[in-house]
């Protein structure tokens, strides 16, 4: 953190002001990971805004991340979907990466669901498995917290109502869902088989390159947070299959209907949780 806190706060407020001018408002935020962005099409009365049209907001450059906000309603609840996210490996600092999340919080959003496509560290979890994040391991080498901010340590365990809402809806809809620890790594390369063995022994169940810093920053801004991973591939060395981003996107698309059914019922409940 090389810039004064006051300057960062002004940057947050500037982006928040630009979001308001774009007509974006919501009660609940949902960040959609690789191959999962199609869920936003389920919203009614949609208002769309490209990240590129919001001055001061970092832009996503990764395939499978459309790079736009879509605001709309589900069951009368105003939802803001972020179709795609930015990552550390795109040359951003932890604070720059979470600037959008903090700005959205200034719009009055009080609950957030962060989703991602992740590599599975368990051989028994086939691609397409959904996992609710119950804890995380941050191996990204930094924190998004500003000087003077404190974190609760595990943002995914502090709001039991959100986790219970996900579990309840999954049971009602007959959607199988696992629970586990998400390990965040810097990327952009996939892990080696040796690293995968280490992460599994470390207590991880899924590995990816996002989500953790966003969740920490969202909690610092006063939002209740929850996380969902779509296991899109076995991590390196668990099977003989080669890893590719194309596979990640394809499995995400295949799981989209089941994933979308879960989100469609869960997100309105977040407004009351």
Residue ranges and their predicted role:
Residues 236-273:
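His/Asp/Glu-rich mid-to-C-terminal helical/loop segments that flank catalytic regions of hydrolases
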Residues 209-247:
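Zn-dependent metallopeptidase/amidohydrolase metal-coordination segment
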Residues 2-154:
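Metabolite-binding pocket within alpha/beta catalytic cores that recognizes anionic/polar moieties
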């Amino acid at each position: 953190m090389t810039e004064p806190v006051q300057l960062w706060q002004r940057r947050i407020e500037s982006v928040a002001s630009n979001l308001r001018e774009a007509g974006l408002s919501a009660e609940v935020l949902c960040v959609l990971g690789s191959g999962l962005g199609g869920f936003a099409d389920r919203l009614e009365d949609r208002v769309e805004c490209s990240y590129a049209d919001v001055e001061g907001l970092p832009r996503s450059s990764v395939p499978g991340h459309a790079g736009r906000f879509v605001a709309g309603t589900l069951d009368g609840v105003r939802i803001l979907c972020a179709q795609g996210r930015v990552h550390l490996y795109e040359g951003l600092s932890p604070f720059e990466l979470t600037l959008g999340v903090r700005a959205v919080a200034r719009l009055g959003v009080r609950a957030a669901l962060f989703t991602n496509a992740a590599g599975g560290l368990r051989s028994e979890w086939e691609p397409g498995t959904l996992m609710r994040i119950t804890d995380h391991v941050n191996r990204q080498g930094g924190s998004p917290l500003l000087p003077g901010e404190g974190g609760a340590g595990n943002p995914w365990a502090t709001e039991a109502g959100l986790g219970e809402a996900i579990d309840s809806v999954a049971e009602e809809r007959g959607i199988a869902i696992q629970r586990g620890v998400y390990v965040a790594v810097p990327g952009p390369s996939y892990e080696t088989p040796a690293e995968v063995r280490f992460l599994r022994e470390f207590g991880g169940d899924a590995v990816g390159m996002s989500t953790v810093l966003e969740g920490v920053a969202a909690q610092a801004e006063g939002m209740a947070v929850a996380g969902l991973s779509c296991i899109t591939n076995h991590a390196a060395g668990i099977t003989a299959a080669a890893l590719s981003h194309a596979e990640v996107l394809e499995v995400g698309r295949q799981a989209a209907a089941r994933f979308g059914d879960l989100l469609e019922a869960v997100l309105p409940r977040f407004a009351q949780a």
